[in-house]
Swiss-Prot record:
Its EC number is 3.1.15.-. NCBIfam families: PRK05359.1. 3'-to-5' exoribonuclease specific for small oligoribonucleotides. GO terms for biological process: DNA metabolic process. InterPro entries: Exonuclease_RNaseT/DNA_pol3, Oligoribonuclease, RNaseH-like_sf, RNaseH_sf. The gene is orn. The keyword Iron-sulfur does not apply. Pfam families: RNase_T (PF00929). This is Oligoribonuclease. The keyword Hydrolase applies. The active site is at 129.
Length: 181
């Protein structure tokens, strides 16, 4: 498969919290799929260095989750800053999708986009202005066909690459069991 405007860019960020004015990106990963959700390639998974002072601002949930996954140690050991992570991610995406072609894809991606806008604006601008947010279908299924949610199993590791793989699989599940295409 080659570069195509029909390919989709999936992204997930792990952050120190939910407020882009205070919190920071600590991990970024991307996956490119074709329009039928077949994974074409996985981009770099990058732990983004943040200071001990920044990490100390995390709440209990983030400390527990990101320490338990090993991400905090990876962030402390990383030499890669926001700009370097942004550049490496764009270099990967340029091989698969023209700039401005793909919506930003994933779960609750408006939150990711807020952080990209603040800390990785060139990457944020690489996406089309539209969103393909799997959490929209999750909310609709919860209200209109809740019985299908029992068949959806997620690990919720809160590791960026795992989360993206689960988002792609979740959309494929909804396509088959909810949208029924």
């Amino acid at each position: 498969m080659s570069k195509s405007e029909h390919n989709l860019i999936w992204i997930d960020l792990e952050m120190t919290g939910l407020d882009p004015e205070r919190d920071r990106i600590i991990e970024i990963a991307t996956i490119v799929t074709d329009a039928n959700l077949n994974i074409l390639d996985e981009g770099p998974v990058i732990a983004v260095h943040q200071s001990d002072e920044q990490l100390a601002l995390m709440d209990k949930w983030n400390v527990r989750t990101h320490t338990g996954s090993g991400l905090v140690e990876r962030v402390k050991a990383s030499k890669i800053d926001d700009r370097e992570a942004e550049k490496a991610t764009i270099e990967f995406l340029e091989k698969w999708v023209p700039a401005g072609a793909s919506p930003i894809c994933g779960n609750s991606v408006s939150q990711d986009r807020r952080f990209l806008f603040r800390y990785m604006p060139e990457l944020e601008a690489y996406f089309h202005y539209r969103y393909l947010d799997v959490s929209t279908l999750k909310e609709l299924a919860r209200r209109w066909k809740p019985e299908i949610l029992a068949g959806l199993k997620k690990q919720n590791t809160h590791q960026a690459l795992d989360d993206i793989r689960e988002s792609v699989a979740e959309l494929a599940y909804y396509r088959e069991h909810f949208i029924q295409l």
